[in-house]
């Protein structure tokens, strides 16, 4: 154990147990919200479509049946969502399209977080000229229309799902950079960060141990909401013909195919449009549920700590007469606070007691 490591093993075990209890409380709050449960179940269904779509699909999504009885068919026992103008099963195409939707979200979201989080940490932690230069670039990109910039980048990289999602991921990284920077700016002024600096921890260790754990709860909410944005932007790009190929089972491409049949068979756009709407709604419902659950836990944490400290002070035995006679200095229930601005006073010492006897 280093000279600066003052955490007792029992404290570590207690902190770990408290962390597990906190996660359990968050999950219980999530599962008590029926809208959040619906969002989680829908996303779980999409993950099944991503991993093994053949388990859910009952037809080949690209097989055409040009017999007159199979063209533009409404939902039936054999074709649950009907068929399109080429006799392809719409239900199977929606299921396999879910695989492309999750793939698009993973590509764009992975790139956005890989760029945005480190850039935001660097900007918020260093400050000064580096912060101003980074945020100038971020603000410029943030102010421009996302679809137009994505079209420009796709024009340079080429059409296709992967180039389109690379463009979307680069542009959406500004959202994560701004969010991470805001948390880093607030956390770097905390007393425990100053203590970590004094103890000799490196910048990387401080960011990993103290800053990132406070960033993740906010990022989880943002990730859920941004996932819906990625799906919408990807569908628009595929609808315009610069994402997935026009004849693919991508949901945006299916909308474009239905647009061509909107007069002869308007129902064709319904399955893919419903899949997009429900998926975006599910991600937003999960994001709202996580935000409410985490916010409730964060608000309750200081109150629980205060209650525990108050119980500890009440349970602390009063100094005996022997201690009072022998001690040159006796202190009980010492509390030290500093003004904390809008957040209230910052308590750095709480309920400390000690005695100094002759010769000590």
Where do the PLM segments sit?
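Conserved A-loop
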Residues: 336, 353-356
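Residues immediately N-terminal to the Walker A/P-loop in ABC ATPase nucleotide-binding domains
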Residues: 31, 355-358
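Periplasmic/extracellular loop-to-transmembrane helix junction in inner-membrane transport proteins
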Residues: 26-29, 59-108, 256-270, 340-347, ...
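N-terminal signal-anchor/first transmembrane alpha helix
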Residues: 14-62, 137, 215-218, 280-281, ...
